[in-house]
Each structure stands twice: as structure tokens, then as C-alpha cells.
């Protein structure tokens, strides 16, 4: 990492010194959140907590008519099940909607085995589905959740009746431009050390701003939630453990083996998973349709939920 970048990070400590409690926070990092308080704030009904066979306690919501067609949502990095709120509000009228907090995210918290490879996430997804007794379903994944959904579909094609990927990671990145600074820092041991010690609500806000095209769409509620879950005990350390490893991109051969009908939704202005990554998926998947949304960044389901719903409904109608 260039020394100028590290210097800029160090200087940013001055702007958050008061918020983080000064020298103590620089040494130890931000205060940890209160689990009971966070559960009271974010875990009210229809939330439930289930225990998987691997011992993980998963925060989950299962809404809509139990007899309706099921649709399962898998959120992205540093998100949680609430990221789907705008889509779920309308989908519960026609679907059984399942969403949950991945390991090290939201109210699920760190995993008992402290492992954060893609195989662990896929295993959790599989166990959640089995726990709920679902045979086949539509699978929707965003960003990292899209990558997890792709990997799950590779191993369980008969269970996924349709696959919807929003700004999914896992494709090769060809742009000469770099990902946002926060992601670059996470790949560097010194960067992770610094982030832990200068992390603040303002930095949580900046992380959200990187995910959208129009930053005015970011609400205080969204910022508070990212901040709250980032200081959930153990979540940040688990994130650093995950970023210390490298998740390999998919190769064309394994992607071409997915015959499931797939919808790709991408923001034209996505700087985290650029449009070219969606085009790569579209070129490799044998039964894919790609929609590119202008003036939208990395979080189309948050930035333009109505447009996403229109695209999903229209596409699903072609499968009937």
C-alpha cells in the first residue's frame, strides 16, 4: 500500500478522535456493542433465532404464506437481512420470503468454528434451507451473497428453480481502476490494524456511500445499522479473519456448468463489482439475462427497489 494512503488514514484519526474516545480507541478500537440491546433493537418479530447442526445460531426471518413459492435472499458483505426490507415489503404478498444474517453479520455474529471460507457460508445456507424444510426455491444473492448463491447452485442445481444475482462478486475484475479504499485496506494487514482502531460511525457512512451512486439515498437509519452491527462483539475480528484469506474468482468452466435460469441485475455506476463483472457472468452462464440500470451503484435493491422488483417480476413471468 502506498505510504501516502496510510498517511491519509492516520490523519483521518484526528477527525474521529472525539467520537471514538481519543487515545483509548486508537489503542483498543471502538467500544463493543451490547448484544441484548442490539437484539431488542433489530431482533423483534418476525425475527427468529434458529440453531443449525453445526452449532451456529442464525438470525432469520421467514415471512409470507408458508404455502407460497419460497424465495431465499442472501445479503452481501457488511450487510444484514434488513438490506432487503424494500423488496420484501412487496414480495411477501406473493412469496414465502426467507432472509437471514450470514455468519459474522448482523445478529448472527461470529461463527462457533471461526471459519469464514466460502464453503462455510454455502454450508450455512444449505443448513438453513434444510432446517426450514424447503425443497426448491428462487435464490437471490447480492455481492458476496451472489457469489455464495452461485457456489450453492453449482452443488445443488436441482433445488434452485431460478437464480437472481445483484452485483455479484466472484467474476474476474478487469478494470484498471482500483476498488474503494476500504476494500483495499482490508486486504492489507496494516490496513486492517488501522481500520480497527480508527473505525467510527462516520467511516461506516463512507462505506455505505461507496456502495451507491446517489449518496442522498443513504439514511441515518442505514448508517446506524451498519455501525451497530460492525461493533457487535466479534463481528469485526471475524471480518478481518475472512479478509486475511483470498476467495478465488470462479473460472469459466465451472460457471458454464450452471444451467439454471439466471437474472443478472447490475448498476451501471457500480465501482465495487463493475458492470464488466456482470457481463462476464452473462457471457459464461448458458441461460442468463442481464439488466443494467443507469445511475445506480452497487446496491440496486436499495437504490431502486421498485425497478428491481419490476425486472424480477417481468423475468419470472417469462419462465412460467
Named regions from a protein language model:
Residues 288-320:
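Catalytic active-site module of serine/aspartate enzymes centered on a nucleophile-bearing elbow/loop
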Residues 53, 61-63, 102-144, 310:
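Active-site loop/oxyanion-hole signature of alpha/beta-hydrolase fold enzymes
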Residues 1-71, 94-95, 135, 316-320:
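Alpha/beta-hydrolase fold catalytic core
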